[in-house]
Amino acid sequence: MINKNEWLTVGLITSCHGINGQVKVKSLSDFEERFLKPGMRWLQKENEPPSKIELISGFKQPGKETFIVKLQGINTRNDAEQLKTFKILVRTDKLPKLKKEEFHLLELINLEVKTLENDELKTIGKVINLENEKNNLLIIELFKNQKKVLIPFVKEIVPLVDIKNQFVIINPPNGLLEL
């Protein structure tokens, strides 16, 4: 479960764009309006508290999972360059309401990963991150060797997500965990 008094990283500023202070944002969110719709946002530099900033405008780059956004007070390329590696955050109490069986992808981080072997559930690792360039992938750290494995987040491979009990069950194709 997401703590209602915390922050959720929904984007990462990766670079500046042009000469008028626009920044390129890698989305970590399924909700594009977070980078398109004007309004207040929060920026965070590593190891510093979040600060409020207004998003003036934004658009999605054609064929990519990145957005170009204009932020209040960021008017030059040098201003934009200072924001490289900043995170864009939302408060968890401002998350969109979901239906009963839905969840936010970021809720998957730190869930235990289990497989069904010989009719028994076996814990094999935990979800340590997500990758969502084109398709959602779970980044799983295996307990037996600390290897990181990418698991496609599709119903056939991840048939059960239990947010309440903090685990997912995966049914990986043969050899996927040995890569």
From Swiss-Prot:
Location(s), subcellular: Cytoplasm
Protein name per the record: Ribosome maturation factor RimM
Record family assignment: Belongs to the RimM family.
UniProt keywords, alphabetically: Chaperone, Cytoplasm, Ribosome biogenesis, rRNA processing
Any single GO BP term: rRNA processing
Pfam families for the chain: PRC_RimM (PF24986), RimM (PF01782)
Entry annotated with the keyword Cell membrane: no
Stretches assigned to the PRC barrel domain: 100-176
Quaternary organization: Binds ribosomal protein uS19.
Example of a GO MF term: ribosome binding
Organism: Prochlorococcus marinus (strain MIT 9301)
Cellular component terms (Gene Ontology): cytoplasm; ribosome
UniProt note: domains: The PRC barrel domain binds ribosomal protein uS19.
PANTHER family: RIBOSOME MATURATION FACTOR RIMM (PTHR33692:SF1)
Domain of life: Bacteria
Disulfide bond residue pairs: none
Function description: An accessory protein needed during the final step in the assembly of 30S ribosomal subunit, possibly for assembly of the head region. Essential for efficient processing of 16S rRNA. May be needed both before and after RbfA during the maturation of 16S rRNA. It has affinity for free ribosomal 30S subunits but not for 70S ribosomes.
